[in-house]
Amino acid sequence: MREIVHIQAGQCGNQIGAKFWEIISDEHGIDATGAYHGDSDLQLERINVYYNEASGGKYVPRAVLVDLEPGTMDSVRSGPFGQIFRPDNFVFGQSGAGNNWAKGHYTEGAELVDSVLDVVRKEAESCDCLQGFQLTHSLGGGTGSGMGTLLISKIREEYPDRIMNTYSVVPSPKVSDTVVEPYNATLSVHQLVENTDETYCIDNEALYDICFRTLKLTTPTYGDLNHLVSLTMSGVTTCLRFPGQLNADLRKLAVNMVPFPRLHFFMPGFAPLTSRGSQQYRALTVPELTQQMFDAKNMMAACDPRHGRYLTVAAIFRGRMSMKEVDEQMLNIQNKNSSYFVEWIPNNVKTAVCDIPPRGLKMSATFIGNSTAIQELFKRISEQFTAMFRRKAFLHWYTGEGMDEMEFTEAESNMNDLVSEYQQYQEATADEDAEFEEEQEAEVDEN
């Protein structure tokens, strides 16, 4: 089987990760003790992608839980599915990273990283055919961002040919935990650009807007935000967990989605959006799902896809529906909005259909877009970074852990390069290539 090793780091990563395991355990008919109570063979057919089978027919998540302080992991352990995880896979320190990237990446995190890698290695060795790793973390704090990126580069060193996939929660001005988030995020992006194959950018601002506008929640809690994230993660991983007509694994997804190695930051979306409390589900049609899925309001990253163009798109539909209708609707969207898709990648929209819908819904759709509009997110962080860095504000917290200002400058310019690369491909057209070829032909003729 093609296994995935899941790692969750830091407070945010552990909270999102715990929700993810709750939702997919439910979808696979696995209860909080790891026992199977399902009703369909499909639930078990690819169960090994995320679960190990233990003695007594129990299913145990192939998850490694990491943090530099014990608090969050205690709450995961005492949470609804806390007993399903393997106790040895909780790896934590006592000191905390204090929202300081340098502590997570260079000092405190570096001390803990080897014991984490031991657990990761153990999980990887028991795999039949490991396809890759997925990490849930945030970029604004200290542990998820600093130690998370340290883990990525160490795992990359040891497993260079395996796919590395991250679900990264990007800080936003509206929902800010700490003032140094722009520093931590920029230093993290600097690492992610080089060391991951696929990164799903999840943005608290976008999640807040969805909860507030669409779901009509007056005071959204982190629980509500994390619920949205876990819906999206469940949708994105559907193809990996269930047999379907278009069976994706992490590598196939990367091949379809990443036209240039650095441009691997995706914008996820989900439809239909219904709040946790509201159970009045109406029967949705495929056209409505398709329409909603491409809507800017449904994006989990606070970027407007209409401000950029899609390089590639993957859509995953779930539920019993006609493939023909799905294909027609997807073509319809592309034809009506052709200016928003780059014309130099033909057939850049891929669609998969899985028969098993998420709990409580007849059908749903998950959207993964590689859009040049994601540059808005990096620009936003970069502006905040520059404002502080120009005055060297808060730098002593980082240099005190042995970091050099040079590293900040490098991270800043790497992120600005990333923005320019997205911009370059946003403006590129197919005719430029034609002109270029004509010029070359002209040169050949002259010679």
Curated annotation (Swiss-Prot):
Pfam families, per database record: Tubulin, Tubulin_C
Biased composition (Acidic residues): 429-447
Region (Disordered): 427-447
Any one GO molecular-function label of the UniProt entry: GTP binding
Cofactor: Mg(2+)
One GO term describing the cellular component: cytoplasm
Disruption phenotype: RNAi-mediated knockdown eliminates microtubules in fat body cells, resulting in defective nuclear positioning.
Keywords: Cytoplasm, Cytoskeleton, GTP-binding, Magnesium, Metal-binding, Microtubule, Nucleotide-binding, Phosphoprotein
Record-listed Mg(2+) binding positions: 69
Subcellular localization(s) per the UniProt record: Cytoplasm, Cytoskeleton
Subunit-level organization: Dimer of alpha and beta chains. A typical microtubule is a hollow water-filled tube with an outer diameter of 25 nm and an inner diameter of 15 nM. Alpha-beta heterodimers associate head-to-tail to form protofilaments running lengthwise along the microtubule wall with the beta-tubulin subunit facing the microtubule plus end conferring a structural polarity. Microtubules usually have 13 protofilaments but different protofilament numbers can be found in some organisms and specialized cells. Interacts with mgr and Vhl.
Reported function: Tubulin is the major constituent of microtubules, a cylinder consisting of laterally associated linear protofilaments composed of alpha- and beta-tubulin heterodimers. Microtubules grow by the addition of GTP-tubulin dimers to the microtubule end, where a stabilizing cap forms. Below the cap, tubulin dimers are in GDP-bound state, owing to GTPase activity of alpha-tubulin.
Family, per entry: Belongs to the tubulin family.
Protein name, UniProt field: Tubulin beta-1 chain
Gene: betaTub56D
